[in-house]
From Swiss-Prot:
InterPro entries from the UniProt entry: Iah1-like, SGNH_hydro, SGNH_hydro_sf
UniProt organism field: Oryza sativa subsp. japonica
SUPFAM superfamilies noted in UniProt: SGNH hydrolase
Keywords for this protein: Endoplasmic reticulum, Glycoprotein, Hydrolase, Signal
Protein name per the record: GDSL esterase/lipase WDL1
Length: 260
């Protein structure tokens, strides 16, 4: 049993998924950006597992998200589907999960997460597109041939979005969000599959948009959340007048992107 132990009174956000989640704290990734945006507002916990599919996630979801944990997450952001969509290997091994089973697995994952508490909110991320040519060149020779195509990514992405509409879940449609950029194929990936800093910016923007627009109580958008120990203090920096202090708790000058 893993369980969670955030700072007292601070909400917990869990990022759960495959390599796009595991790598999200590297190279300007979207997880690292969220951790910065929510500094002193929420604890961002990484539960990313490279190579995983929805079948493997479902097998251990009770261990990763135990229902008897004394602390339950306020938000879980979930990504599975890219590995599920890989073509089936002739050996029967590998990450491929048939589309109908993928849909059923994601439904069960959503049901489990929604049952954790009345305040646990869920956002799914759908499959992004690929740069197939770059991916073919970057795939390690230690692996058997891996067949990933944009056509199957599209099918699994559309299935995820449709499921979320059916279940009244929030979803980031990465398939379409990425392709709003004319240069998405070259700008949004490091290896044709995993997200670059530019690709991660799109993920962050879409997540923040959902959190801002969602009619959730309490609101989980960063601007609506209190800053931990954000009260004025005589120990803050002294103002130019020399007669008072300036509270820096919510300063964001260090960010190259001023997120909405």
């Amino acid at each position: 049993m893993l369980g969670f132990a955030p700072a007292p009174g601070r909400p917990l956000f869990v990022l759960f998924g495959s390599s796009i989640v595991q790598f999200s704290f590297s190279n300007g990734g979207w997880g690292a950006a969220l951790a910065d945006i929510y500094a002193r507002k929420a604890d961002i916990l990484l539960r990313g597992y490279i190579g995983w599919n929805s079948r493997r996630a479902l097998q251990v979801i009770d261990k990763i998200f135990p229902k008897d944990s004394p602390v339950q997450p306020s938000l879980v952001i979930v990504y599975f589907g890219g590995n599920d969509s890989v073509a089936a290997h002739s050996s029967g091994l590998g990450p491929h999960v048939p589309l109908e089973e993928y849909i059923d697995n994601m439904r069960k994952i959503a049901d489990h997460l929604k049952s954790l508490s009345e305040k646990t909110r869920v956002i799914f991320l759908s499959c992004p597109p690929l740069n197939e040519e770059t991916l073919r060149k970057s795939t390690s020779t230690v692996l058997s041939e891996i067949v990933r195509t944009n056509e199957t990514c599209r099918l699994y992405s559309e299935a995820c979005v449709s499921l979320c509409k059916e279940m009244d879940l929030k979803v980031v449609d990465l398939w379409n969000a990425m392709q709003k950029r004319d240069d998405w194929a070259t700008a949004c990936f490091t290896d044709g599959l995993h997200l670059s800093e530019e690709g991660s910016k799109i993920v962050v923007e879409e997540i923040l948009r959902i959190l801002k627009e969602a009619e959730w109580d309490p609101c989980l958008h960063w601007k609506a959340m209190p800053t931990e120990f954000g009260e004025d203090s005589p120990y803050d920096l002294v103002s130019s007048s020399g007669q008072s202090t300036v509270n820096p708790s919510d300063w964001t000058f260090h960010r190259t992107i001023q997120w909405d």
